[in-house]
Amino acid sequence: MRGVIVPLVTPFNEDYSIDVPALEEHIDFLQKAGVHGIFINATTGEFTSLSVEERKFLAEKGRELVNTTFYLVGTASTNTFEVIELTKHAQDLGADYVVIAPPYYCPLNETALFRHYSMVAERTDIPIILYNIPSCANPLSVQLIKRLALEYSNIAGVKETIDSVNHVRDVIIEVKGEREDFMVFTGLDQHFLNTLILGGDGGIMACANFAPEVHLALYKAFQEKRFKDAFIYAQKLARLSKVYDLASSFGSAIKLAMSLRGFSIKPVLRPPYIIDGDEVKEEIRKLLREVLY
């Protein structure tokens, strides 16, 4: 798996129930756009605000709908046994990969983190993509990622949502250097091109929910060695990623941007998250106009 993977938003109705028609419409849009993977129950999908039953429902619904690209399911939790349960569920319904962020809230050392992932890897067969997001969860060091990758063949890759070129470089050199099939994806739109240049496999990036054409154009240009064009698209993504700085949360930023671009997904976040007001919406409108039009 390589290229542009979209961490899907979860559409909600005004009463906070899951908006299934909007989910169906968005998945159809992304598949027609030509993205290389769709990732449900992601951070962007507000998985921490969903019950286990809702996460299973979304995973099942996504499996019904995603039929032209790779299908990834997020199975992270602070409870190791819940991760195993969700991972087995994703495996049984035929997902291609699971994506597992580390436990959050309580600090854990590397021994505990290794045990957490090893318990999941030993009890399931589905390929696992580690998810390093140190701003929200316990960090995964290069050496821990390497140890997991070399000891468990079903630990297939890592998503790096970390604002550090050096860290991503070291993962690519240290881990891919010893296991060529280990995949490295950036989780940050603004790091897409440099991750590819360093030898990474692509990106799992939230702005691709509302502007996948930019990410896809960059990837195509890079693959075809049209590097001047790739630089232009990378500059667009660098500017577009400023959307996160304008809103109180990335969820608010993405859903407001989607509403401004005409998607039917409502600007509704589940509590405790809130959608920002008209002032922020206008700032996002201005940014989108400058970058995309």
From Swiss-Prot:
One Pfam assignment: DHDPS
Domain of life: Archaea
Family, as annotated: Belongs to the DapA family.
Biological processes, Gene Ontology terms: small molecule metabolic process
Gene (UniProt): dapAL
Catalytic site positions: T43 (charge relay system), Y105 (charge relay system), Y131 (proton donor), K159 (schiff-base intermediate with substrate)
GO cellular component: cytoplasm
Protein name, as recorded: Uncharacterized DapA-like lyase TON_0506
Keywords: Cytoplasm, Lyase, Schiff base
Localization per Swiss-Prot or TrEMBL: Cytoplasm
Record Gene3D superfamilies: Aldolase class I
GO molecular function, one term: 4-hydroxy-tetrahydrodipicolinate synthase activity
Residue intervals passing through the bilayer: none
InterPro entries registered for this protein in UniProt: Aldolase_TIM (IPR013785), DapA-like (IPR002220), Schiff_base-form_aldolases_AS (IPR020625)
Enzyme class: lyase
EC number: 4.-.-.-
Self-association state and partner proteins as the record states: Homotetramer.
Disulfide cross-links: none
